[in-house]
Amino acid sequence: MARAKLPRSPSEGKAGPGGAPAGAAAPEEPHGLSPLLPARGGGSVGSDVGQRLPVEDFSLDSSLSQVQVEFYVNENTFKERLKLFFIKNQRSSLRIRLFNFSLKLLTCLLYIVRVLLDDPALGIGCWGCPKQNYSFNDSSSEINWAPILWVERKMTLWAIQVIVAIISFLETMLLIYLSYKGNIWEQIFRVSFVLEMINTLPFIITIFWPPLRNLFIPVFLNCWLAKHALENMINDFHRAILRTQSAMFNQVLILFCTLLCLVFTGTCGIQHLERAGENLSLLTSFYFCIVTFSTVGYGDVTPKIWPSQLLVVIMICVALVVLPLQFEELVYLWMERQKSGGNYSRHRAQTEKHVVLCVSSLKIDLLMDFLNEFYAHPRLQDYYVVILCPTEMDVQVRRVLQIPLWSQRVIYLQGSALKDQDLMRAKMDNGEACFILSSRNEVDRTAADHQTILRAWAVKDFAPNCPLYVQILKPENKFHVKFADHVVCEEECKYAMLALNCICPATSTLITLLVHTSRGQEGQESPEQWQRMYGRCSGNEVYHIRMGDSKFFREYEGKSFTYAAFHAHKKYGVCLIGLKREDNKSILLNPGPRHILAASDTCFYINITKEENSAFIFKQEEKRKKRAFSGQGLHEGPARLPVHSIIASMGTVAMDLQGTEHRPTQSGGGGGGSKLALPTENGSGSRRPSIAPVLELADSSALLPCDLLSDQSEDEVTPSDDEGLSVVEYVKGYPPNSPYIGSSPTLCHLLPVKAPFCCLRLDKGCKHNSYEDAKAYGFKNKLIIVSAETAGNGLYNFIVPLRAYYRSRKELNPIVLLLDNKPDHHFLEAICCFPMVYYMEGSVDNLDSLLQCGIIYADNLVVVDKESTMSAEEDYMADAKTIVNVQTMFRLFPSLSITTELTHPSNMRFMQFRAKDSYSLALSKLEKRERENGSNLAFMFRLPFAAGRVFSISMLDTLLYQSFVKDYMITITRLLLGLDTTPGSGYLCAMKITEGDLWIRTYGRLFQKLCSSSAEIPIGIYRTESHVFSTSESQISVNVEDCEDTREVKGPWGSRAGTGGSSQGRHTGGGDPAEHPLLRRKSLQWARRLSRKAPKQAGRAAAAEWISQQRLSLYRRSERQELSELVKNRMKHLGLPTTGYEDVANLTASDVMNRVNLGYLQDEMNDHQNTLSYVLINPPPDTRLEPSDIVYLIRSDPLAHVASSSQSRKSSCSHKLSSCNPETRDETQL
């Protein structure tokens, strides 16, 4: 095929540069010559055209030719090179300015030398002229100008001054030439140029005219040129070292130099002019200037002639104009510096330790939480905190940072973490850690997370070796900051904690107390026994130690974990909860009896303080042993933990009771049964029940508490006889659809087939089922309702812990999501695989929505803080709507357990608020006193928080701060909350103490029983007790026997408290309609006893008050009946059955015993009788067990040894399940 010819360019028809036709072939290049080498042009040698190829002559044939291009040729000129050396180059120009500054200082020094060597009394005259003597006549008004015009200058001094003047003149001319920009007059009339000419040209003239060598030249004016050179030199110096935050330093330097120049000019000027007067010395003139400028004016030295007087006036006027301007600029810069915070010096960063706190906006609550928690650790007292925030300090933060306690340790810098200059100011690369916190009160929390992510990236880019501690809000954004050393996701922890609150009461309080640093001294001055006990146990935290270095645990090397946990608690009062192998990074909570301890293991334990700060007082231990064996003081109540020495022996716990019967003491309002008889064996009360010893090594028959895989009998679902529902088989597996990247896989109970989206809607029927209300579903267990604004990805973490594989299938509670907005498709896809999970659109402030979602059949209601209300125009008002709505629900549904999330922890005092409650006022005073004492847990005595009924996510901020010292705290917290699952690690659950368990008597004996029978580790108690909240204890008294009547009908006090694991749900007031008349009769009996006691125990005034309370109770009861009628009418209007509400609307005395700071029936009769609940973390071994106690347990992983021992478990599980994992949860048929 013939090749097509390229069309000719217009230039091809013209002659080439060498005169040859364009069409002629170009000379071939030598063989082997690279076409990349520059081609040699043809034509004559002198032809400029032959050396450079024209731009328009780039044809196809010349495209391979190259032209060497030289850049920045404009800088090759002589002027540009001089400009580069004298002006542009930072280091060379700095040297030039330093030389110029030294030159000016030298001229001022030479002037002072000339003044000191000059003596006017020896004669005055020009160079080589005859000298004339002059004496001042004070009476004459004429001035002899000769002493002012002529001075005595030595030859050597003159020569030096001439040389310096010539150098200064030449340098000035050169700089004028280099900085010339077209306007010469601008250069000439500059003050610095005029001064240069005045001080240099006369010296140059004296070279050619010798008589003028004694002419006076005001060389002292060079001080102003020196000041100008110093300013330029400092600017160049800062530019050379890349220091940009130097305005304050420059202004201070300018002000100081201005003052110095004014004084020096006035001193030298007055001294010279007074040569025609009294001939003042330089020192006297300096004294006069200082006295005059300081406005003192003694009058002992005064100028005598008018020129010197005129100079003084001029100098004062200049000072009055210049100095205020300088001071104004200095004050302005100082105020700006106060706002921006200045710098953290490099020297301090290298010699001191500091951490950096990066926040979007700094609020006083966040600041104090951080400072109190960070500086609660003794080894952090010498650390500095540098706060980097883009906003100005508000008034409250500024006031706090001016307190001497914080002003010496906290440095506030206004700046952005995205700017390297601000990170340099904070010396991020030298920091020990960087905490990056998100602004949770923003309306757009996703945008707040994005800002946090960028800050984390910026810090990692600038200081890759600085440890990062990042707080993120949304779980879907967590994977962007996985590179950080420690990450806390707020919504993950929040929802998991609220979920556990439904099955393990007050988990939020338990975790909050664990992650706060405390010495256990809160409430120790309170007269209330429960406050002292609660405050003392709140000081327990998680610590770690290497087993081989531990006095607590090293004696148990080679023993089982369970054996070590029990004996360490028995001997030292410490609670061993987990460990970590040296060759494994995973932390295992309660790995079980088959785990043998090694010296290299890292042990994690709960105690008041770490072992290194503990003292061992063995003498007291021996005394207490003797007392224990003699039967004295064994059951006198909870032992007091020593605070100063922290750890001493808790005494040996006797494992056999000393008697067959014991009447508990009534202390501080705690109540129990009148008689607690021990169970008998073979019909005889002579034998005491025994507890099996904890084995050093687990034998083959040792069982974990509940093996959910090998024993399926527990999970077999019995079809309901009256409902006729089809049995749905559940499977165990991992959820197939995670709503976000980075969620930890957890083995859960799942549906074998995903439920259609239409079946997830609770209040609307579909083609698969026609149920439109909760009762129609016929749930065996009570509902858990979650009220949230949107179905965010964090809500997924509420469901997973409640559907984890280790939860008994018979204990799974139906979950109803009450959402303000319709969930999206991705969220429904994630939850459709879980059994008994439904949603409904509605709001918590709408009664119809609450009734439709089945609130009267609910066991727990969780009210999640709404994102749209987290920010308010007025501080702390963000929770107003939530608080009022929850208060309304308490009035409408008093038997419901409600857990509320608040934005601000300080607002928890408004939960279940009663204005005339004297006990709440007393607690408020206690909180203020604890806050004044510097406690980190001042809010802990608020009854809603102590009972776990209120929670704020800001309480968990300390988890991130505490991780700086304890890098394992986030991992342990996530394991306890069920967010992470590690093979072989246990999980948190709870067990309820019933009257049948009271024979165990003490917490230490319970510890032994659980360790020996089911390998469970108890870590605390959730206690509910009655309390008399009265100003006069004699006014109203409640006998324990009065409570026994109701307990005989409804069971133990804590039967309404939801538990998890093997513990069971709460009884409702309407389990059997037939029992309500009996309960109401018991309530009336209680009221009659109360009415009989009141007149006896009080005088006439008390009786009158009692009568007024009775009248008030009648009014309140009518109010409750009105609310009840309102609810029933709405239920009838919606087509819902009212039988359930009729049952639960009537509360009895035992209901009150199970409510936290509630109890409308008894409380309306008198405002003093009530109950309270609180958490005891790791109580002493001899702490008395009480009915209604709920014990927190860490249960071993049931999958830990399935492969090795499934057969042995199967054979022996049948006769041990009744004792190891008792079923105490009553199933309520709806």
Swiss-Prot record:
Outcome after substituting residue 820 to N: Dramatically reduced the Na(+) sensitivity of KCNT1
Gene Ontology process terms (BP): potassium ion transmembrane transport; protein homotetramerization
Location(s) in or outside the cell: Cell membrane
Parts of the chain in the membrane but not crossing it: 282-302
Lipid bilayer topology: Multi-pass membrane protein
Keywords: Calcium, Cell membrane, Disease variant, Epilepsy, Glycoprotein, Ion channel, Ion transport, Membrane, Metal-binding, Phosphoprotein, Potassium, Potassium channel, Potassium transport, Transmembrane, Transmembrane helix, Transport, Zinc
Organism expressing this protein natively: Homo sapiens (Human)
Binding site for Na(+) 2: 761, 764, 771, 779
Pfam families: BK_channel_a, Ion_trans_2, Slo-like_RCK
Protein name (database record): Potassium channel subfamily T member 1
Residues annotated to bind K(+) 1: 296-297
Positions that bind K(+) 2: 778, 787, 818, 820, 842, 865
Listed transmembrane segments: 94-126, 154-178, 193-208, 216-233, 247-274, 305-338
PROSITE patterns: RCK_N (PS51201)
Reaction it catalyzes: K(+)(in) = K(+)(out)
Glycosylation site list: 133, 137
Residues forming coiled coils: none
Region Disordered, residue ranges: 1-37, 660-689, 1048-1078, 1204-1230
Regulation: Activated by high intracellular Na(+). In addition to activation by Na(+), is cooperatively activated by intracellular Cl(-) levels. Inhibited by Zn(2+). Activated upon stimulation of G-protein coupled receptors, such as CHRM1 and GRIA1.
Subunit structure of this chain's protein: Homotetramer; which constitutes the Na(+)-activated K(+) channel. Interacts with KCNT2; these heterodimer channels differ from the homomers in their unitary conductance, kinetic behavior, subcellular localization, and response to activation of protein kinase C. Interacts (via C-terminus) with FMR1; this interaction alters gating properties of KCNT1. Interacts with CRBN via its cytoplasmic C-terminus.
Residue ranges, Extracellular side: 127-153, 209-215, 275-281, 303-304
Gene Ontology CC terms: plasma membrane
Stated consequence of mutating residue 865 to A: Dramatically reduced the Na(+) sensitivity of KCNT1
